[in-house]
From Swiss-Prot:
Species this protein is from: Rickettsia peacockii (strain Rustic)
Protein name: UDP-N-acetylglucosamine 1-carboxyvinyltransferase
Protein family membership: Belongs to the EPSP synthase family. MurA subfamily.
Active site: 119
Gene responsible for this protein: murA
Annotated InterPro entries: Enolpyruvate_Tfrase_dom (IPR001986), Enolpyruvate_Tfrase_sf (IPR036968), MurA_subfamily (IPR050068), RNA3'P_cycl/enolpyr_Trfase_a/b (IPR013792), UDP_GlcNAc_COvinyl_MurA (IPR005750)
EC number: 2.5.1.7
Residues engaged in binding phosphoenolpyruvate: 22-23
PANTHER family: UDP-N-ACETYLGLUCOSAMINE 1-CARBOXYVINYLTRANSFERASE
Amino acid sequence: MHKLIIHGGTPLKGSINISGAKNAVLPIMAASILTDKLHITNVPKLTDVSTMKDLLRSHGADIEIIEHQDEFELIIDTKNINNFTADYEIVRKMRASIWVLGPLLTKYGKAKVSLPGGCAIGARQVDLHIAVLKAMGAEIEIEDGYINASSKGRLKGPHFVFDKVSVGATINAILAAVLAEGETVLFNCGREPEIVDLCNCLITMGADIAGIGTSEITIKGKDSLNKASYKVLSDRIEAGTYMFAAAITKGDVKICGIDYHIVENIALKLIETGIKVVPINNGVQVTYEGKLNSVDLETNPYPGFATDLQAQFMSLMTLSSGVSMITENIFENRFMHVPELCRMGADIVVRGNKAVVRGVEMLKGAEVMASDLRASVSLILAGLSTNSKTVLHRIYHLDRGFQDLEKKLSNCGADIKRV
């Protein structure tokens, strides 16, 4: 099994190009089921993308892959979909597999999807997915670990209020509603840029969607959608991760290929800590200026601070000049990186959904183990900050969400190798 060897202590200097957003491309790939052909560009080279390709092919899709140096193009032909079951063997690898449920159900009137897998960071129940589809008229039962869904005729657009903000359920609801009969109005929706990107793709396909980027989305169902081409937006989580990498290594890095407005909440939090962050043409520049203040943080649905960057921010706070309180409001059990950071000399105490981080002068290298995707990269950031050697095990998580991570960091001076 591969591992990463990191020799820290070098400030990162240079520029990093950001890849396409994983959390946007996966639902957009699922949206291909709604039409006959979808051409997607700026597709990142990630194992989760490969898993979604395998899933779509299992349903009967034909996928042409055009490989470029830094991205894929995908041409997904779904006119011959003939299998409506998403098997456990594929779905267990990735929670995003559940996003085929809405498209299969709304277009074909039936779908059978295994209960999903993915990172081990909490229950992340599918109740809201099921509730909104039932409100559209679907009949749904859970049997033997599968969601069995069917409808008599077309789904019908409801007025539906999500009990809590759910990115995943918002996506499934939108994917189902674009072909449902009548008007769907969804309240308390996720507002994430990746949801906006999905909606923009669907509009390119001919969907009628209003309220994009707000908590109230209105969709007028169409009889069918068109073939289309669409470029996926850049990954704000990847961008934020490298912004924190620049800060924790006392570096100076230009993050390129990202719209500043979708990373502005990250930039503002870094500025609070004393890091210099300025917008540049097609990106942002992050520069350490000699101090790192302790800052409290709460994760919240967008435009709040992303839970997917909580672990990276915690790594930064381990070296701050004071005490910070980090509150995780999205997922339970998302502090699994804490024991590993403590192995490296961090002073962190977890109390329920809160972590108290007391800054130390320096972390030290150690052998550590990744528990999930975002935890793994937080340990890399910690390793880069030390003046010694860190060995990171179970790095297969990284390839689910970060393209060419070692290469991008090495190009900025990091000593990091996969062995």
